[in-house]
Amino acid sequence: MTGVPWWRGHRGEWWVVGQGVLIAALALAPAVWTWAGPSRGLWRALGGVLIAAGVTLASTGIVQIGRDNLTALPHPPARATLIQTGIYARVRHPMYGGLIVAALGWALWKTSGLHLILAAALTAYLYAKAGYEESFLAARFPEYQAYRTRTKQLLPWIL
């Protein structure tokens, strides 16, 4: 602990607050600009599959990163090590990627245009947060640049 209040945000605390606000908005927003009709069941099924895939990706990231590395903050903990195995051999930020996939799934489940907009906003936000986090990781771990060139940032094989 440095004695600096959390609200000064020197470790990226405000990034976590913003992420929480977007996730809460996505979870609690009413379904607006909905598309219904005979295909609604298909959209909900696809949404359910994406939610399950996103939760699986994020959960795998949480388990494999280990307790010493786990933090919601962009700044890595003092005891952190660079994990490059398991899911981290394919994607650098599987927890963010999982949130993105689950958010899209939730929007499809809700069949709501507002939820699609919020999922897109969360995607852009997590992409920016990952970039901010990577500046700390590159400064901390000399091998991070090589790791960055051989792995995707958020979604395996895609982004």
What are these regions (language model features)?
Residues 1-85, 97-159:
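Membrane-anchoring alpha-helices and their flanking helix-loop junctions
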Residues 91-92:
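Conserved SAM-binding loop
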